[in-house]
Regions:
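Metallo-beta-lactamase
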Residues: 78-201
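Short, glycine/acidic-enriched loop or turn micro-motifs at the edges of active sites
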Residues: 28-29, 58, 146, 198
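Active-site beta-strand termini and strand-to-loop segments that position acidic
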Residues: 16-19, 110-111, 133-135
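Terminal amphipathic helices with adjacent charged low-complexity linkers/tails
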Residues: 196-213
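Active-site neighborhood of phospho(di)ester-bond hydrolases with catalytic His/Asp-centered motifs
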Residues: 24-26, 48-56, 76-79, 139-142, ...
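Active-site metal-binding motif and surrounding structural segment of the metallo-beta-lactamase
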Residues: 19, 30-77
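Short, small-residue-biased leader/transition segments that mark boundaries at the very start
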Residues: 2-6
Length: 213
């Protein structure tokens, strides 16, 4: 049931601390206060330079406007399709002078960390992109490689991830294959999805499962 899924779903957002600081995506509207508090704790008085928006589905993008109210000097990083959707979703959001439009393959240097943006259209929305941090060898995979379930519950990844894959991205198999081919060219040691746990070990297993499913 939808309510059961909702009760057992984790929404992830990440912060990269460097000479310039980047926040990766926001979270569902229901967790606005908790999320902003967590971001503030991690920033520890610093101001974020960038908000990277990989995916405009409401459970990840709902707090863009709230974030910009809290940190009005932040530059929003996204692709053209994402900014178009953002304008439709947030009629009162003024990002004049606060946009960084990226194309497929563009990079952004934060200091030691260099982020490269790889477009992944229809995994599972048309504007989706993923982000690769070549310094720490991290793939911020948007909805890819996510799973249902809470983070405080120990459970096998495959079962809930397969259910998630079938329900969320499975119908876009060709697009997933394109993403897997792109991922195969990268030295990935960590996968950070927008749902579920961070994946750090035996990454070939997860890539293989996505190929099979």
């Amino acid at each position: 049931a939808a309510s059961d899924v909702y009760k057992r779903q984790a929404y992830n957002s990440y912060v990269i601390l460097d000479e310039k600081t980047a926040v990766m995506d926001t979270v569902d509207a229901n967790f606005k206060d908790e999320w902003l508090e967590n971001v503030a704790k991690v920033l520890d008085g610093a101001k974020p330079d960038y908000l990277v928006v990989q995916h405009m589905e409401p459970d990840h993008a709902a707090n863009i406007e709230n974030f910009m109210k809290a940190y009005p000097d932040t530059t929003v990083v996204a692709n053209t399709k994402t900014f178009t959707m953002m304008g439709n979703f947030f009629r009162n959001l003024n990002l004049d002078g606060k946009k960084l439009v990226v194309a497929n393959g563009d990079s952004l240097t934060l200091g030691k960390h260099v982020l490269t943006f790889v477009f992944a259209p229809m995994v599972h929305w048309p504007e989706v992109m993923v982000t690769y941090d070549s310094t720490d060898k991290v793939l911020f995979s948007a909805d890819g490689f996510g799973k249902f379930g809470a983070l405080d519950v120990e459970e096998d990844w495959d079962c809930e991830a397969r259910r998630y894959y079938i329900g969320i991205v499975g119908k876009y198999g060709a697009q997933v294959q394109k993403l897997l081919k792109a991922a195969a060219t990268l030295d990935i040691q960590t996968i950070c999805p927008l749902h579920g746990p961070i994946l750090t070990e035996n990454l070939g297993h997860y890539l293989e499962k996505y190929d099979i499913w």
